[in-house]
């Protein structure tokens, strides 16, 4: 159930499609700190929206999130000035278009390995004549106003994930597709593709070299690059390298880590930050 607070926020917030806020950040050469919504709860989404993230990504691939929950999470994002993105489960036109109709301002798509796959992704995100997106943005129109249709093609962000050897080999082809705005590095699958264990915050010299190469090729094409991180300190290192979006863990892992720390501090002492109960 969507909270009354969420519904009220949708009625009073006035956001236009004149410029995607994430595009505005990047145009100013500022990095975006991205949160990751994997829990199927509008309340947890609302909590995350109030935490100060620049962007929040609804994870429909590995998160416990179906389409109806994704809509609720984007409504939760509307309670604060946070830009909603979505990681779709696959490069499939139907779910991409429905996610955009629900109000996502950017699509992160997994396992884009070739130029043809990047072209298909762009086509699903763009209205004619730049793509094949079907028109029917019911919630997006309500959220962003009458200028949505006119501005969607230039403001919606198209972000293929780079997470295989094949994708790395095809970086120039993928980045040369008109309409691709940025890349997003998936470090766990990227590591698997090179024979390493799946994890975030890669520290293996070979993979660090690959990540640097991805960033360099993106910059060569005038595109931005994001990456999924675990520790905030690692995210800051990525910003220093030139990444312009970094995800910190997931909502579930943030909750788990905070809960563990609170239990440990209570049982063993130390780490008491104080604060309100509610």
Tell where the protein language model's regions lie, with residue ranges:
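Expand to "…catalyze enediolate/carbanion chemistry for C-C bond making/breaking, isomerization
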Residues: 6, 12-278
């Amino acid at each position: 159930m969507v909270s009354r607070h969420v519904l009220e926020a949708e009625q009073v917030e006035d956001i236009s499609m004149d410029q995607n806020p994430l595009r505005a950040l990047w145009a100013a050469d500022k990095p975006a700190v991205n949160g990751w919504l994997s829990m199927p709860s509008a309340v947890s989404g609302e909590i995350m929206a109030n935490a100060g993230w620049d962007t929040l990504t609804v994870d429909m691939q590995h998160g416990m999130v179906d389409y109806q929950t994704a809509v609720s999470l984007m409504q939760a994002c509307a309670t604060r000035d946070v830009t909603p993105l979505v990681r779709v489960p696959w490069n499939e036109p139907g779910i991409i278009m429905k996610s955009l109709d629900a109000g996502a301002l950017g699509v992160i798509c997994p396992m884009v390995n070739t130029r043809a796959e990047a072209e298909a992704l762009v086509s699903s995100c763009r209205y004619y004549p730049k793509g094949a997106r079907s028109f029917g943005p019911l919630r997006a129109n309500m959220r962003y106003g009458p200028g949505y249709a006119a501005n969607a093609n230039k403001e919606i962000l198209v972000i293929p994930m780079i997470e295989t050897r094949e994708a790395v080999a095809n970086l120039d082809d993928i980045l040369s597709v008109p309409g691709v705005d940025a890349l997003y590095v998936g470090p766990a699958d990227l590591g698997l593709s090179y024979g390493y264990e799946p994890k975030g915050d890669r520290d293996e010299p070979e993979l660090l070299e690959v990540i640097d190469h991805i960033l360099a090729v993106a910059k060569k094409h005038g595109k931005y690059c994001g990456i999924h991180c675990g520790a905030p300190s690692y995210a800051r290192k990525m910003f220093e390298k030139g990444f312009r979006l970094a995800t910190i863990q997931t909502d579930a892992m943030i909750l788990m880590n905070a809960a563990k720390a609170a239990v440990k501090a209570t049982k063993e002492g130390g780490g008491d930050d104080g604060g309100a109960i509610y």
